[in-house]
Every structure is written in structure tokens, then in C-alpha cells.
Amino acid sequence: MSLFEWVFGKNVTPQERLKKNQRALERTQRELEREKRKLELQDKKLVSEIKKSAKNGQVAAAKVQAKDLVRTRNYIQKFDNMKAQLQAISLRIQAVRSSDQMTRSMSEATGLLAGMNRTMNLPQLQRISMEFEKQSDLMGQRQEFMDEAIDNVMGDEVDEDEEADEIVNKVLDEIGVDLNSQLQSTPQNLVSNAPIAETAMGIPEPIGAGSEFHGNPDDDLQARLNTLKKQT
């Protein structure tokens, strides 16, 4: 603490002074509330004594006690009025503090906005916006070009696969027609010897059939055609 503060006291801001006064008012309100509770207890005690004096026939004592009761209730009423006034003053102080805080906040915000406006370069911001829009359009065009190129490549591959499938199916169909026509024109004695020819070509015999197995040549040829189609 400096000598100036020790002699004249610490320099207190208006906000701190208002806060200090508000604390003092709240402390006074609590003291008034305690005194009011004491008077209320005194009120109940006087009422009990007045009833007791009246039962005992002590009229004079009852009148004195009644006057004390009236004064006590008047004090209670005064304490209520004082407390209400102090609460009103405390609310006003709180409103002043809030207004001061809001004023300072608005002042700081105004200064901040003013500084931002001074440092903001509108022409530069406009150039940046135009350049951003230009680059975005360029990127969109390049993306469209890449998408079209990929679609073309994938489309060619799909077309090639479809054409290859058509050729294979056509060849297999032609082979099937030729084989069927040959089977229809083959004599019965050649058909009976078909298992021997198929064995010479490398067709495996069924398990357990031995050399006496005689299969149907039409079924065997059809099975071979189906196998070729599945492999393609």
C-alpha cells in the first residue's frame, strides 16, 4: 500500500462503491429481520400474559400489557416498512450496476467493431471472393471432365463384355444345332458304339458302371454344351 492510499484511502471505482453499498443494505435487512422475529416472539408472549391477567381479574395489568402489545405491533409494522424500503433501494442499486455493466460491455463491443471496420480491406475481400469463385468453377469443370472420361471407359468395357457374351452364346448355339442335326442323322449301330468313342475321347466313366455302361449320347453332348456355357 502506498503512502497516498494509506492517507486518503484506496481509490474505489463507482462499480465497487455500488457493490459495497449493496452489501451494507443487505446486512441491514438481515438485522431488521432478526429484530422483527424478536418482536413477534414478544407479541405472542404479551398476548399470553394479557389472557392470564384477564383470567385472574387483573384488569389494570391487562391494560398495561395491551398497550405494550400495541407498541410492539407498531414496531413490527415499522420494521416491515423499513425492510421494504431497503429492498427497493437495493434493487435500484442492482439496476444501476447492471446498466453500468451493460454500458461498458457495449462500449467495448463498439470499440472492437470499429477496429475491425478500420482493418477490413473491402477491395481485397472482393478480389479474394472473385478468385475463390473462379477457382471453384474451374474445379467443377475439371471434375465434370474426369467423370465423363471415367464413364466412357467403363461404358466401353461394358460394351465389350456384352459383345463377347453374344459371340460366345452364338457360337455355342451354332455348335448345338450342328451336333443335334448330326445326332438325328446318325445310324442306330453307330449310336450303340458311342460309349466306346466317348471313352477314346477321354470322357470319364461313371463310378461302378465298368465297361458295360451304355449312356445316352444326346444327354452326354448336352451336358458338355452346358459345361462350356458355364465356363464362359
Curated annotation (Swiss-Prot):
A motif (MIT-interacting motif) lies at residues 219-229. InterPro entries: Snf7_fam. It holds the Pfam family Snf7. It is found in: Cytoplasm; Endosome membrane. GO terms for biological process: ATP export; endosome transport via multivesicular body sorting pathway; intralumenal vesicle formation; late endosome to vacuole transport; protein retention in Golgi apparatus; protein transport; ubiquitin-dependent protein catabolic process via the multivesicular body sorting pathway. Keywords: Coiled coil, Cytoplasm, Endosome, Membrane, Protein transport, Transport. It comes from the Eukaryota. It is a peripheral membrane protein. Residues 14-97 form a coiled coil. Its main location: cytoplasm. Residues 203-232 are annotated as: Disordered. Residues 183-232 are annotated as: Interaction with VPS4. GO terms for cellular component: cytoplasm; ESCRT III complex; multivesicular body. PANTHER family: CHARGED MULTIVESICULAR BODY PROTEIN (PTHR10476). Required for the sorting and concentration of proteins resulting in the entry of these proteins into the invaginating vesicles of the multivesicular body (MVB). Acts a component of the ESCRT-III complex, which appears to be critical for late steps in MVB sorting, such as membrane invagination and final cargo sorting and recruitment of late-acting components of the sorting machinery. The MVB pathway requires the sequential function of ESCRT-O, -I,-II and -III complex assemblies. Can directly stimulate VPS4 ATPase activity. Core component of the ESCRT-III complex (endosomal sorting required for transport complex III). ESCRT-III appears to be sequentially assembled as a flat lattice on the endosome membrane and forms a transient 450 kDa complex that contains DID4, oligomerized SNF7, VPS20 and VPS24. SNF7 oligomerization into a membrane-associated filament is nucleated by association of SNF7 with VPS20; the process is terminated through association of VPS24, possibly by capping the SNF7 filament. VPS24 subsequently associates with DID4/VPS2. Belongs to the SNF7 family. This is DOA4-independent degradation protein 4. It comes from Saccharomyces cerevisiae (strain ATCC 204508 / S288c). The gene is DID4.
